Amino acid sequence: MSFNAKDMTQGGQIASMRIRMFSQIANIMLYCLFIFFWILVGLVLWIKISWQTFVNGCIYWWCTTLEGMRDLIKSQPVYEIQYYGKTFRMNAAQVLHDKYMIWCSEQLWSAFVLAAVVALVICLITFFVVSWILGRQGKQQSENEVTGGRQLTDNPKDVARMLKKDGKDSDIRIGDLPIIRDSEIQNFCLHGTVGAGKSEVIRRLANYARQRGDMVVIYDRSGEFVKSYYDPSIDKILNPLDARCAAWDLWKECLTQPDFDNTANTLIPMGTKEDPFWQGSGRTIFAEAAYLMRNDPNRSYSKLVDTLLSIKIEKLRTYLRNSPAANLVEEKIEKTAISIRAVLTNYVKAIRYLQGIEHNGEPFTIRDWMRGVREDQKNGWLFISSNADTHASLKPVISMWLSIAIRGLLAMGENRNRRVWFFCDELPTLHKLPDLVEILPEARKFGGCYVFGIQSYAQLEDIYGEKAAASLFDVMNTRAFFRSPSHKIAEFAAGEIGEKEHLKASEQYSYGADPVRDGVSTGKDMERQTLVSYSDIQSLPDLTCYVTLPGPYPAVKLSLKYQTRPKVAPEFIPRDINPEMENRLSAVLAAREAEGRQMASLFEPDVPEVVSGEDVTQAEQPQQPVSPAINDKKSDSGVNVPAGGIEQELKMKPEEEMEQQLPPGISESGEVVDMAAYEAWQQENHPDIQQQMQRREEVNINVHRERGEDVEPGDDF
């Protein structure tokens, strides 16, 4: 409410102008309806009675009207009455008492009443129809006119009716919204911050997958899905630290050299900033060593780790001779080989957690498990799980397993009617899956249904790169956008939901003291606008999202309700690991990492030393050729030799000094020869070394870089 004179003047002028304009329209409508009423009455009378009856009836009612004035009229009028071709002459008194004339008057009156009722009803209907048409036209003039783009609705049942009308509604629903039939093979993307509701959507889809008996591979980072869905009779778990872990066999899983290469590509990912030589060399050594061990009857994960990390570099060189990896451990570049093995340590150390799982029953391979899919009965699920405190250590192995499962889909053969689900919440918490970009577009031919949850599109770009991330995101057709707090990410989500093209209506008023100046002008301008603003994305409550379906269907604002699920199994059961073997492997890893740190220092640029005036004078003398022998003598005087490449002579400590740095009880090859001495040294110097080794960050220690580059791709999220 405002008592400001300006506001009251403006409001009064506009109200007065509206009243005048409404009065004009009302007068025109009533005038037209009045004329229309009598036209209708005349038409009904013409249809209902004859002309003779109409005329005679009118004469009767005219005489009735003049009856009270008959005594005042000196000369009584005579009326000619038509009666079926005959003419009779009657005065007013005769007309009023004639039975035929009375009958004609009754017929005329009844016909007139009927005609008036019919005309009134028609006029009322006409009035409302005209009012609705005029109101609709006025509303259209004042509303935006949509000319293209996508629409937005907050009622999922409207979209459900559209899908049902088109015959494309599916039995799979997210809340009240059905997805498009068979669109599950076109993949899902769940985008939003933590705790917004992505896992709830995955659970809704997982319920349908369990009811239909579909095969499912699910990445469970926290154990929540194991707790709610694990069925030990048909399901499998892959978690190196879980007692229920299947006895996965690397050498039965990988039958050919390319299989080992693919496994190494995921186990040892390429960094985004580091020199790819180090990771690529580590991949080659791991793949070749594992391939050579396939025919060893005593092969095991412990032996594989020992071969790669424990034995001397000379023995590793002998083991890899006549293989493509032999060039990477040659004696001429031994220092580089030691650095490559240090890189290998960061990722292969995750394999040590697999030691002992071969005793967990029959050998298990993901490839054979997926080939055993049955369409006539319910299929099992594969849970690839971890927990928060061990995820960083298990990430290479988990990424490797998931990559094998993704490739295993192609080995199942083409079948569009089959459904194999891959649920991966928080996908960027894994290493880059190299085959995902190529396999995802083709997976629909094999019945693959991928459901990926990400916190932001920036995570995909950080892990996979700009172009690969765009390719992945483009093949995820059904999308749900939950809350994104940051402006940039929320703006991206708003753009992906879509925009509409419309003619935006505008209305302007002009008024003045003279009514001639009063007027209203309307117009429309073309405009493109996003369906939702980034602020709408930022302010979404939990369990509320915008869902976009493939095809010409509106975007839907969907609200979900959390559904509690009973606990059917423990999320995690610790597995007993051989402590002696674990201690030995920990010691080996400690030795290799210490060796890697020493080698890393050799590849760092030297800091120039401040020299005295004498040295400056000597340095101004012309340089003379220096023989290698003289150079060795001068190496003790503090002159630094730059480490510019792998072919240069690098200053190394004597082997005796290296042995002195190893803990007591550790041999030169890194093996534990005196467990009691080593454990005593641990208790005295490093009481918490075991815990530190388990949780050590996976840092590339072989190239000099900034501290910020030590983070794995995706660890910032």
Curated annotation (Swiss-Prot):
It comes from the Bacteria. Changing P396L: In traD39; temperature-sensitive. It is a multi-pass membrane protein. InterPro entries: P-loop_NTPase, T4SS-coupling_protein, T4SS_TraD, T4SS_TraD_DNA-bd, TraD_N. It is found in: Cell inner membrane. CDD domains: TrwB_TraG_TraD_VirD4. This is Coupling protein TraD. Interacts with relaxosome component TraM. May form a hexamer in the membrane. The gene is traD. Conjugative DNA transfer (CDT) is the unidirectional transfer of ssDNA plasmid from a donor to a recipient cell. It is the central mechanism by which antibiotic resistance and virulence factors are propagated in bacterial populations. Couples the transferosome to a type IV secretion system. Probably forms a pore through which single-stranded plasmid DNA is transferred to the secretion system. The last 37 residues are important for determining plasmid specificity and transfer efficiency, with additional specificity conferred by the TraD-TraM pair. Signal peptide: none annotated. GO terms for biological process: unidirectional conjugation. Residues 1-27, 131-717 are cytoplasmic. Residues 48-104 are periplasmic. GO terms for cellular component: plasma membrane. NCBIfam families: PRK13700.1, TraD_Ftype. SUPFAM superfamilies: P-loop containing nucleoside triphosphate hydrolases. ATP binds at G192, T193, V194, G195, A196, G197, K198, S199. Belongs to the TrwB coupling protein family. Changing D715K: 10-fold decrease in conjugation efficiency. The chain crosses the membrane at residues 28-47, 105-130. Its main location: membrane. Residues 614-639, 650-669 are annotated as: Disordered. Keywords: ATP-binding, Cell inner membrane, Cell membrane, Conjugation, Membrane, Nucleotide-binding, Plasmid, Transmembrane, Transmembrane helix. One of its GO terms (molecular function) is ATP binding.
